[in-house]
Amino acid sequence: MRVGMGYDVHKLVEGRDLILGGVKVPHTLGLLGHSDADVLLHAIMDALLGAAALGDIGKHFPDTDPAYEGISSLKLLEHVRDLIAKKGYVIENIDATVIAQKPKLRPYIEQMEQNVADTLQIAKEQVNIKATTEEWLGFTGREEGIASQAICSLTGLYEASMQVGGGCSGCGGCQAD
């Protein structure tokens, strides 16, 4: 089993949509970035890439490349999924936290989880997303930006096939002996 951790921060600005977990969240401010600046998906991608020892999103999707300008981070997550699979890993689980003073994210969490699960082709039960504030402290508390942290676990295909109970919780394509 391999574990990865991801962290990302983006500044809140006027004139941009707030996209978190592939969901357009109603808010007066949005996140500044080269892509759609989806801080949640960026943290998840970094966790996945880290667990597979594949670097980080800056390596794969540099902000100097015009091909990624304004791109949906869900598209980038698809590419990360393919890199993970090509290296022989399946995703066991993802746990992520969004840190934002505003807006309240509870109404959007379930759709965020579904978007991540659908894009990664895993069960929704393998994805957990939480939201919290920093009680008006720091840059997130002052509503200057939003941060996200994520952790994931991956299992190699062979290791997963040897697990008791029918293999890993990934694609469902293999079964334990």
From Swiss-Prot:
Keywords: Isoprene biosynthesis, Lyase, Metal-binding. The keyword Membrane does not apply. Signal peptide: none annotated. PROSITE patterns: ISPF. Its EC number is 4.6.1.12. GO terms for molecular function: 2-C-methyl-D-erythritol 2,4-cyclodiphosphate synthase activity; metal ion binding. The keyword Nucleus does not apply. Binds 1 divalent metal cation per subunit. The record marks H34, T133 as: Transition state stabilizer. Its cofactor is a divalent metal cation. It is an enzyme of class 4 (lyase). It catalyses: 4-CDP-2-C-methyl-D-erythritol 2-phosphate = 2-C-methyl-D-erythritol 2,4-cyclic diphosphate + CMP. Pathway: Isoprenoid biosynthesis; isopentenyl diphosphate biosynthesis via DXP pathway; isopentenyl diphosphate from 1-deoxy-D-xylulose 5-phosphate: step 4/6. 4-CDP-2-C-methyl-D-erythritol 2-phosphate binds at residues 8-10, 34-35, 56-58, 61-65, 132-135, 139, 142. A divalent metal cation binds at D8, H10, H42. GO terms for biological process: isopentenyl diphosphate biosynthetic process, methylerythritol 4-phosphate pathway; terpenoid biosynthetic process. Belongs to the IspF family. Homotrimer. Involved in the biosynthesis of isopentenyl diphosphate (IPP) and dimethylallyl diphosphate (DMAPP), two major building blocks of isoprenoid compounds. Catalyzes the conversion of 4-diphosphocytidyl-2-C-methyl-D-erythritol 2-phosphate (CDP-ME2P) to 2-C-methyl-D-erythritol 2,4-cyclodiphosphate (ME-CPP) with a corresponding release of cytidine 5-monophosphate (CMP). This is 2-C-methyl-D-erythritol 2,4-cyclodiphosphate synthase. It comes from Agathobacter rectalis (strain ATCC 33656 / DSM 3377 / JCM 17463 / KCTC 5835 / VPI 0990) (Eubacterium rectale). The gene is ispF.
